[in-house]
UniProtKB/Swiss-Prot annotation:
Transmembrane segments: none annotated. The active site is at C65. Transferase that catalyzes the transfer of sulfur from thiosulfate to thiophilic acceptors such as cyanide or dithiols. May function in a CysM-independent thiosulfate assimilation pathway by catalyzing the conversion of thiosulfate to sulfite, which can then be used for L-cysteine biosynthesis. GO terms for molecular function: thiosulfate-cyanide sulfurtransferase activity. Belongs to the GlpE family. The keyword Transferase applies. Its EC number is 2.8.1.1. It comes from the Bacteria. This is Thiosulfate sulfurtransferase GlpE. It is found in: Cytoplasm. Residues 17-105 form the Rhodanese domain. PANTHER family: FAD-DEPENDENT OXIDOREDUCTASE, THIOSULFATE SULFURTRANSFERASE GLPE.
Amino acid sequence: MDQFECINVADAHQKLQEKEAVLVDIRDPQSFAMGHAVQAFHLTNDTLGAFMRNNDFDTPVMVMCYHGNSSKGAAQYLLQQGYDVVYSIDGGFEAWQRQFPAEVAYGA
């Protein structure tokens, strides 16, 4: 895959339920602590190395941000690092929280 794909929150949720992909959240620490998808890994410059050590390049990665814009750059970056399949989640955390309020965790 040379280009990331966009995915809606319903499809992203299904991929998580079926363990077909991992979810990363690239928002700032304060926003992440105020609420994030239950299964999200908080991906930052400081946690990138750990994420890459723990997730093979053939593991599909879904990137979540605030509204679905910043995630596109991060998705492209992960492709450039060697990940085979990367998705940017349309609508970001705001859409996730609206559609799946019961699947939001709080705290870091």
